[in-house]
Amino acid sequence: IRDRPTPVVGVLGVMEDVEKAIPHALPSADEQYTLILLGETKDEFGGSVWQDISGAGLAGLPPQVDLANEARLAEFFAGNAAGIAAAHDLSEGGLSQAVFELLLGSDKGAELNLEGVHADAFTALFSESASRVLVAVTSDRAEAAVERATSAGILVTVLGETTNDGVLRVAGEEVQMLE
């Protein structure tokens, strides 16, 4: 049991058709997907999972929420949900955890390039910057998704593609995925 206070914000809404909900994991092993990061990655580790497990203790400021980008993301998803195969937040564990959870159970791997995410690979993988979403779109819809997000004013980074070998590769290096 943690002894640190945790502020919790809850949001409740009504979804008219639950069949239109975007899953947080890949829905089909038969498709090829392009993985895209929406939003800016910053050097923000205050209160993060990494900070907690590294023994550094929880300290510093939490990631700053970009309300303007949150609004742009909400508009993007409201108007484009049909083209998104899966989406995952990056709030707990950063990009590394989001990619793992997206792939889990799909028998898919991925080939990722982090160059456009952040200059520092560690920050790119583990930062918990707010106002970011990892999305998977079928590869034939990737260009259209990038165009829609860019025209909505959202920073877009194409990370790479899924593979059928079940292996995650980051910058050409294999990453062991353990359940």
Positions of predicted regions on the chain:
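Glycine-/charge-enriched secondary-structure boundary and capping motifs
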Residues: 1-8, 12, 59, 74-179
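Phosphate-binding glycine-rich loops and adjacent basic patches that engage nucleotide phosphates
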Residues: 35-42, 58-66, 107-108
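C-terminal transmembrane module of polytopic alpha-helical membrane proteins
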Residues: 65-73
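Glycine-rich anion-binding loops of enzyme active sites
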Residues: 1-46, 161
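Gly-rich Lys/Arg/Thr-decorated short loops/hinges at beta-loop-alpha junctions or inter-strand turns
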Residues: 6, 45-63
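Short, glycine/charged-enriched secondary-structure capping and boundary segments
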Residues: 24-25, 50-51, 101-103
